[in-house]
Amino acid sequence: MTEPSAATTSLVSDFNIKKILELLPHRYPMLLVDRVLEMEPRKRIKAIKNVTFNEPFFNGHFPGHPVMPGVLMLEALAQTAALLTFGESNHKRQENQLYLFVSIDGARFKRQVTPGDQLVLNAELLRSKSGMWKFKVFATVDDEVAAEAEIMCAVREDKSKGDA
């Protein structure tokens, strides 16, 4: 992915955890994005997940050798992509909307992620149409790729809202 010029990159110092909680329905233990560092609306986003030993998945993955599950790296990347989708003023997530995984292609896990690592999450919008969004995503630790994939997500109505 090419780096945009400083003039086109939006440095989002106010895009902290409060803003993330406004845009994503995820909560502990499934909220996997801590802060957005950069966002270029409708193009790309860069965020972070600080990985600590206190993550609940480290209890069993693996005792004595804690490693962040690859599927959770992909989930963190999907949440980052959702922030790019809903971080625009003209496409805010409504209370009755869900952001769902539709597909994952070419997923590769290239580096173990362990407690103390800072996972840098990147998503680039490839295309969007009719509530479907396709992204190239990758996560790095210390500038080394840990995971990469192409993902497709969809915005759909949450039909469970209002059901008892």
Swiss-Prot record:
GO molecular function: (3R)-hydroxyacyl-[acyl-carrier-protein] dehydratase activity
Compartments where located: Cytoplasm
Xref: SUPFAM superfamilies: Thioesterase/thiol ester dehydrase-isomerase
Catalytic residue list: H61
Top-level class of the enzyme under EC nomenclature: lyase
Family assignment from sequence similarity: Belongs to the thioester dehydratase family. FabZ subfamily.
Main location: cytoplasm
Protein name per UniProt: 3-hydroxyacyl-[acyl-carrier-protein] dehydratase FabZ
Gene3D superfamilies named in the record: Hotdog Thioesterase
Keywords tagged on the record: Cytoplasm, Lipid A biosynthesis, Lipid biosynthesis, Lipid metabolism, Lyase
GO CC term, one of those recorded: cytoplasm
Organism: Ralstonia nicotianae (strain ATCC BAA-1114 / GMI1000) (Ralstonia solanacearum)
Stored HAMAP family: FabZ
The UniProt record lists the keyword Chloroplast: no
Function: Involved in unsaturated fatty acids biosynthesis. Catalyzes the dehydration of short chain beta-hydroxyacyl-ACPs and long chain saturated and unsaturated beta-hydroxyacyl-ACPs.
Reaction catalyzed: a (3R)-hydroxyacyl-[ACP] = a (2E)-enoyl-[ACP] + H2O
One GO biological process term: lipid A biosynthetic process
Pfam families: FabA
EC number: 4.2.1.59
Gene it is expressed from: fabZ
